[in-house]
UniProtKB/Swiss-Prot annotation:
Effect of loss of the gene: Late embryonic lethal with no gross morphological defects.
Entry protein name: Phosphatidylinositol 4-phosphate 5-kinase type-1 sktl
Annotated organism of origin: Drosophila melanogaster (Fruit fly)
Biased composition, class Polar residues, residue ranges: 52-62, 105-131, 678-702
Domain PIPK intervals: 155-573
Length: 792
């Protein structure tokens, strides 16, 4: 009895369990039939038995998938054939059929459903299977299939037009208010204006949806614009006169960039945390700009918020670092770190990629060379800006470097000119092969060939290109709206350097050289300064320091980041141009620049009586005052010296010959009267320094180390010297000297000499003459120095 009850109860429980089982097992088959019907036109006809419907008789038996009429491997072959017939694309139905056939005999139904759902999800994310409707998303920025850009699901065109309306209203209304001193409350002031489509008493009508526009610290930003010399009318003309241009290359955070038509300002979307941090930064930012407006930090001119459809889009207006009318051959985002600081493959494939620190080390292993004054000005500016950022606890900023290669640009223009000339020649040759014209010109192809050769030869000259004069005129006449906005203005105040007439050099950049001696123009600035060292960044640094080297990651404490940033910029990125300074002579006295640049004043007239006897002249044609420093010698002086030396060569040679004859005659006369001695002639070279501009005390201090035999320099009589000086950059090195023979005079001699003023004086003295002849050798000449030491 009990056994019967158990037998009667078992089917009841079994039926309850089997009522739900057929539906679950038949669900994959139903999905398969639906998918096959959808793609019926794309599939090869395959005979598949219809799905069996569940019946009460079948419920009692264990449910198994219906056997397929396909032989093992037949479905796989059909799958390949269908895939090849459709260009090798794996359709959804074929994938589903293959998966069901394999999993029906090997996996349970629950695992089959999970695998099919995963496949559907993966295929739905594939743009090739969804008809290309997949959107590219980076942050809040999305790009649809047709190229339409949205930010927070708001069209970019609506954002652009709305902020132009808001800026036009706020700046215009603020211009009517009188100017006053900036107060602390002005940094926290906010103003909100509603813009209905039909307009209001203070806002114009527009074709956009209803939105609100918020302005942060309008009076404070007006002060910043005045500090950089931006008039309200000019700011409105730049922002609102024409539609803004959207940059196609967004930042790493997915921000949207708008550029004004005149290339002066750029508007960037920022996050809420960055907007709040900039508000807190405004008082310190104001203090820094008041003390030093020449900085590489971003120059902010406005902070706004666009509110539409319960979403806020925050934007900041600032100066544009990279002019769009100048081609940037390379762009670098440098932080001084090395961990994952290499551009990705997707970034490298862009038309204008932005490289990073490791890429810069590969492209410029020895860095970029700057002149000494430019290097010092740049590094002092970076040091000061890093100190300001460190005081605000800011890190993770970077230096944006845009490089314009002048030599490469000239080469590209030359190639373009040659291609244009060849295309013109080909067109004329093809026209000549056609029907003859009324006035045929047989010399036209030859003339075009000559023109092509002329273009090639003209283009080979450095600094010449098509439109160079026009571009140069634009660069020289174009006055930037924002003061101190260019890279050169940001680091130095010397902006009065004229451009060369034969060079097409863009204005505003910093001149530099590569290790291959290529001419470069740099456009630099510090960006991304709205990242503070908050708790999130501290945790990121701690986590990365555990896994990797903490000194190489980008995120670190502000003090260490500033030091690492300065070291990388000053030692790896930028370097001084290697120079070879001239070695000075042993003189301790430095000749003033005024004396060096007035050689005409060094030739006072000499008046000597005709019958007077002159004593031997102490000629110092080899030793001189120290050569001036490299910076003291201007190009005009060197050019003037080189040209005047050719004109004075004949006259100087004649005068030197006359002087030599006179000196020999005088010395022979002295030897006849007072004693015997060997006559010594003085040789003057064209390239020599003379110490005629110095006094006797200077000579005593300069040459006090020279040897003398029984002489006292303090008892020397006034001597006459040849007043000659020709500037040169040749380094003179003393090799040695030959000491002469002491010749005592037989008696006293009367010496008639003339001073500088022309007065004659006769002095009787007993002299012991010691002649020292020093041979001075230089790379390009050899001169002789004669010194006469007098006894006490």
């Amino acid at each position: 009895m009990d056994t019967r009850v158990e037998l009667e109860l078992e089917p009841v429980g079994k039926q309850d369990r089997l009522k739900d089982q057929p539906d679950d097992e038949n669900e994959p088959l139903e999905n398969q039939l639906e998918l096959e019907q959808e793609h019926k036109s794309l599939l090869t006809p395959v005979k598949i038995p219809p799905a069996q419907t569940a019946s009460p008789d079948q419920e009692a038996t264990p449910s198994t998938p219906p056997p397929m009429s396909l032989q093992p491997g037949t479905s796989r072959q059909l799958f390949r054939d269908a895939a090849m017939a459709h260009g090798g694309q794996e359709t959804t139905s074929l994938l589903q059929q293959e998966l069901n056939n394999i999993a029906a005999t090997q996996t349970p139904a629950s695992k089959l459903r999970s695998a099919s759902s995963t496949l559907d999800a993966s295929i739905s994310r594939n743009p090739s299977t969804t008809g290309g409707k997949h959107e590219k998303k980076l942050g809040h920025r999305r790009v649809a299939e047709g190229g339409e850009v949205t930010y927070k699901k708001i069209q970019s065109k609506q954002i652009m037009g709305s902020i132009q309306l808001g800026i036009q209203h706020t700046v215009g209304s603020l211009a009517s208010k009188p100017k006053r001193d900036l107060l602390m409350n002005d940094f926290w002031e906010m103003e909100t204006i509603s813009f209905p489509p039909d307009g209001s008493s203070i806002t114009p009508a527009h074709h956009y949806n209803d939105f609100r526009f918020k302005v942060y610290a309008p009076i404070a930003f007006r002060y910043f614009r005045d500090l950089f010399g931006i008039a309200p009318d000019d700011f409105l003309m730049s922002m609102c006169a024409s539609p803004l241009r959207e940059l196609s290359n967004p930042g790493a955070s997915g921000s949207i960039f708008y550029l004004t038509t005149d290339d002066e300002f750029i508007i960037k979307t920022v996050q809420k945390k960055e907007c709040e941090f900039l508000q807190k930064l405004l008082p310190g930012y104001y203090m820094n700009l008041s003390q030093n407006p020449r900085t590489l930090l971003p120059k902010f001119f406005g902070l706004y918020c666009f509110h539409y459809n319960s979403k806020n889009v925050r934007l900041v207006a600032m100066n544009n670092l990279l002019p769009s009318d100048i081609k940037m051959h390379c762009k670098y985002d440098l932080k001084g770190s090395s961990f994952r600081r290499k551009a990705s493959k997707a970034e490298r494939q862009k038309a204008s990629p932005t490289f990073k620190d490791l890429d810069f080390a590969e492209h410029h292993p020895n860095g970029i060379f700057l002149e000494t004054d430019k290097y010092n000005a740049l590094m002092s500016t970076i040091k000061r800006d890093c100190m300001v950022l460190e005081s605000f606890q800011i890190m993770d900023y970077s230096l944006l470097v845009g490089i314009h290669n002048l030599d490469l640009a000239a080469k590209e223009k030359r190639e373009e000119r040659i291609l244009n000339a060849r295309a013109k020649l080909q067109r004329k040759e093809s026209a000549a092969q056609g029907p003859p014209s009324l006035n045929p010109d047989d010399d036209a192809p030859e003339a075009d060939q000559n023109q092509l050769q002329a273009v090639a030869s003209y283009a080979s000259i450095p600094g010449t290109s098509a439109g160079a004069a026009l571009n140069r005129t634009r660069s020289m006449n174009r006055q930037r709206l924002v003061a101190h906005s260019t890279a050169l203005e940001s680091i130095t105040a010397d902006m009065d350097v004229p451009l060369e007439e034969d060079e097409d050099v863009p204005a505003g950049g910093i001149p530099a050289r590569s290790e291959n001696d290529e001419r470069l123009i740099l456009y630099i600035g510090i960006i991304d300064i709205l990242q503070s060292y908050r708790l999130e960044k501290k945790l990121e640094h701690t986590f990365k320091s555990i896994l990797y080297n903490g000194d190489t990651v980008s995120v670190c404490r502000p003090s260490f980041y500033a030091k690492r940033f300065q070291d990388a910029m000053g030692k790896q990125v930028f370097k001084k141009t290697p120079t070879f300074p001239l070695k000075h002579s042993p003189s301790k006295r430095k000749t003033s620049t005024t004396q060096l640049r007035s050689p005409a004043s060094r030739l006072p007239p000499l008046s000597t009586p005709t019958n007077a006897v002159r004593q031997p002249i102490m000629t110092m044609s080899g030793m001189s005052t120290p050569p001036p420093a490299f910076d003291d010698i201007s190009e005009e002086d060197i050019t003037a010296a080189s040209t005047s030396s050719l004109q004075q060569q004949r006259s100087s040679n004649q005068s030197n010959n006359n002087r030599g004859e006179t000196e020999v005659a005088l010395r022979e006369g002295n030897n006849t009267r007072g004693g015997s001695g060997e006559p010594s002639s003085t040789y003057h070279t064209q390239y020599s320094y003379d110490s005629s501009g110095r006094t006797g005390s200077a000579l005593t201090s300069d040459y006090s180390d020279d040897e003398s035999t029984g002489t006292d320099l303090s008892s020397r009589l006034p001597k006459l010297r040849t007043h000659r000086l020709t500037k040169t950059s040749v380094q003179v090195t003393t090799v040695g000297y030959v000491e002469g023979v002491d010749t005592p005079p037989k008696g006293g001699q009367d010496v008639v000499h003339a001073d500088v003023n022309g007065k004659t004086t006769m002095t009787t003295t007993t002299m012991l003459t010691t002649t020292k002849t020093a041979h001075i050798q230089a790379p390009s000449y050899t001169s002789t120095l004669v010194l006469n030491d007098l006894p006490r």
